[in-house]
């Protein structure tokens, strides 16, 4: 049903009021993608792109939206929040049922919470207790990825680039069995942006909320190791029984899951858990649709939930991370003093991932011990290996495709397809144009990255966008916005 211009105008005024009351950052996080879908007979339906946004807005902002709309239309009876594209992939075939599951021991349930900090990402199996039965050892070992006690919701720095993912993670951790689940919840971001922090915070908070809950946190590599070891030791059935009896499965670094048989077992596991209304949370360095090493049915199942991106932290978030890190360091050394001027400078200069920021702070701590009067110029010398002042950031075509697709609300698959509808052609041409002006890639190389197109197609797109932007101020502003987003988030 077409929406009247009157309803659109009312909606625009409501959005303006929302932004004024809540601030631009909160508005952008929760309401930036709202659209009025229908307005008739006192009922207004507002659409959002995900079930998570619908649930969050219903739970936190529906009364405010209704109040603001009633100021525009006293005849309003009801506001409904609906999902624009609520498609969900079902299972393609019934999976064979495993033998009845056995209950995991209390030791297994809480092995995570007692885990020590691991110096690296390669997990090692716990040392078996002398004299313990083989099956008991196996059950104890199933939760082999330890939690880092530093990774909690309280120590996570929230901001515009991760606010939605943070809210979803808290909702999952704090939900009861009857609560709305975002299932599976899929978090994706490049390295060092807080995925592992959020996943471990979910596990820790879930155990805190319900100590009897059965929580499994492990990396994809550890999952592969466990299954390979179980198959070698003829314990595969025992492992499957343990895993099917859990309440919350959390898998990190999904992009490393390799092997047809391992992927088959993983797909079978998440199908079983999801069909049993058990929560699954997964993280990777890219969206499910771009995990090309995964079998199509695994990608399909992961695509059936809520996928949320976490992007690079802004200045305020980086400064918050540094201040939190300093406060933690002062617990061990109360005399430690790093000025606000230095923290501000580092936050402005180190613009990459949280890991780079952590490395910069560790350098500061080390130098502070024998250079207490350290200067800004000296800091630039010390941190030269972390940042290069004036060095242009390298932008990848994949980053441009991802950010342009998100901006125009299309998928990367559509961007690379042969579809010729206007809603796809314009974003595709914009992405080709930006690939030409923001990367050193040749026209033939750009064409190959866009679904194997000929270089003349790319040249046509570049020239068309150049011509249009010269006469269309709106398009010129869009291109400038996209350039900033790409430079900030690539």
Swiss-Prot record:
Binding annotation for ATP: 192, 194-196
Protein name: Chromosomal replication initiator protein DnaA
Region annotation (Domain IV, binds dsDNA) ranges: 369-490
Region (Domain I, interacts with DnaA modulators): 1-75
Biological processes, Gene Ontology terms: DNA replication initiation; regulation of DNA replication
Localization terms from the record: Cytoplasm
Protein family: Belongs to the DnaA family.
Function: Plays an essential role in the initiation and regulation of chromosomal replication. ATP-DnaA binds to the origin of replication (oriC) to initiate formation of the DNA replication initiation complex once per cell cycle. Binds the DnaA box (a 9 base pair repeat at the origin) and separates the double-stranded (ds)DNA. Forms a right-handed helical filament on oriC DNA; dsDNA binds to the exterior of the filament while single-stranded (ss)DNA is stabiized in the filament's interior.
Residues covered by region (Domain III, AAA+ region): 146-368
Single GO MF annotation: ATP hydrolysis activity
InterPro entries in the cross-refs: AAA+_ATPase, Chromosome_initiator_DnaA, Chromosome_initiator_DnaA-like, Chromosome_initiator_DnaA_CS, DnaA_C, DnaA_dom, DnaA_N_dom, DnaA_N_sf
Keyword terms of this UniProt record: ATP-binding, Cytoplasm, DNA replication, DNA-binding, Lipid-binding, Nucleotide-binding
GO cellular component labels: cytoplasm; plasma membrane
Comment, domains: Domain I is involved in oligomerization and binding regulators, domain II is flexibile and of varying length in different bacteria, domain III forms the AAA+ region, while domain IV binds dsDNA.
Segments of this protein annotated with the region Domain II: 75-145
